[in-house]
Amino acid sequence: VTVLTRLVDLRDLQPSQLYISEAKLDRIERKFDTSHPQGVPPVPIVRLDGRWMLTDGHTRAFALYRSGAREVRVIDEPDALDWAAYRVCVDWCLDEGIEWVGDLAGRMLPPREFEQLWLLRCRRMQEELARLRGEG
């Protein structure tokens, strides 16, 4: 199966994540050549409310940004995800002034803090959405 990728300016992608895991960033920067978009696997994006949004790959995109790259290879998000949850995450980002991956600079956290401040927050939000939908 051939997956079509294209290059997109990092400034044109809305993050859906408030923080970057320092540990994951370190692994990515050691594993891939982050000096150019072809050195990193493509990141999935989707058009949500008129804007291109990262659904995953925030750390890869941020690693490219840190190395001075201006673009990232993207693929269209292949899965049907919980778009209500992503809208909540994007709203959190906008409330914190995060409108592109460069805005995540200074928001890198060690693993324990990343778990507490981001992953647990997302889990609670997903549980609340499930409760509101009558799923929980």
Task: Describe each region flagged by the PLM.
Residues 51-136:
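Basic- and aromatic-enriched surface patches that contact anionic nucleotides/nucleic acids
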